[in-house]
């Protein structure tokens, strides 16, 4: 038995994302008092009382003739078509506005079970005739922010979705905890959402020529070559000095937090905007967090054929110069809008994910260590004593982390550590991932 789907619909700033967060078991949506914060439909597992369901938050709709408005309507329409129940939300403080009436008619034409939710009712609330004129037979007053009225909402939901069909027990979590989480990150307008839509072959995410359309990290569960993958689209990351609006600061914080919990990060770069310091800053942040990374240059179809070879040479030079800590990182050149080379990106993610999880036996590590340190020993110190790295072991994966035992670890230079790391990459075929070394002093400094 599958979980029922409940879709939240309403004009901007009526509290849909607040209710989404209130009912969500898992990830939270960004909440801000600026209308239109949510621009894509978002999914989460929801629960109210004993009833568990799949909850969809939709963009706030208003009368808007431009292309952005049309795309928002398309997102909401898809969410309504998926729904078993629609929760149509209005603002109890402002009362019924013209946009509420238009949207009410829009929802009713789909002839699906629906509940009118009047939000922001912190005090006792009486429905007047304007609410009845919207044409919904079920109404409930709540305060999503304070959690009041949820018992009444539960009763209305159960009335619309018969208990024997909708309430589930002992159902496995459909979102596996061990899936490969791939975050798509980069500067605004690099084509992150277009890339994900092309992969899943669905206009799941809002796209367009406007920079900064994506404002929240959006999760999409997907299967690729029998692998359970969670694709996470993030808001574009600009330099801190150029972020002025509080909403964009929230979006940037959400994107950075998504990187922290990723397995692999796809860094999307616009081929028409030369590699900038911000791209390198994002890549460095990914590496510092210990994530594996795949670099993707999008809009490759817009680069002149006569310029592509020189472009690639310069690009590889910049990456190798500024990101030596992930030497050999995969770089792919794609056109998301034309679906050119997009599957190669997923193949690269799967490959580097396996490397990121690599475990090397202690015997092989120390065989390699002895050979490498003998080939290039550390210099003699004062008094003729030599710093030695005697032994090593792998302490963790994701990323591969190693503990090395030395008679004088504080004398091991950064350049010698880079030598060891780069040699290890080649010896154990570990390109493009962060490798971490920690040094420990042996008990006998003369050994």
UniProtKB/Swiss-Prot annotation:
GO MF terms held by the record: GTP binding
Transmembrane segments: none
A Pfam family reported for this protein in Swiss-Prot or TrEMBL: KH_dom-like
GO biological process: ribosome biogenesis
Domain KH-like: 358-443
UniProt domain EngA-type G: residue ranges: 4-165, 180-357
Sequence positions that bind GTP 1: 10-17, 57-61, 119-122
InterPro entries per the UniProt record, alphabetical: G_ENGA, GTP-bd, GTPase_Der, KH_dom-like, KH_dom-like_a/b, P-loop_NTPase, Small_GTP-bd
Residues that hold GTP 2 according to the record: 186-193, 233-237, 298-301
Keyword Zinc-finger: no
Alphabetical UniProt keywords: GTP-binding, Nucleotide-binding, Repeat, Ribosome biogenesis
CDD domains recorded: EngA1, EngA2
PANTHER family assigned to the protein according to its UniProt record, in alphabetical order: GTPASE DER (PTHR43834:SF6)
Role summary: GTPase that plays an essential role in the late steps of ribosome biogenesis.
NCBIfam families for this protein: GTPase_EngA, small_GTP
Family: Belongs to the TRAFAC class TrmE-Era-EngA-EngB-Septin-like GTPase superfamily. EngA (Der) GTPase family.
Oligomer status and interactors: Associates with the 50S ribosomal subunit.
Record's protein name: GTPase Der
Species this protein is from: Rickettsia felis (strain ATCC VR-1525 / URRWXCal2)
Record gene name: der
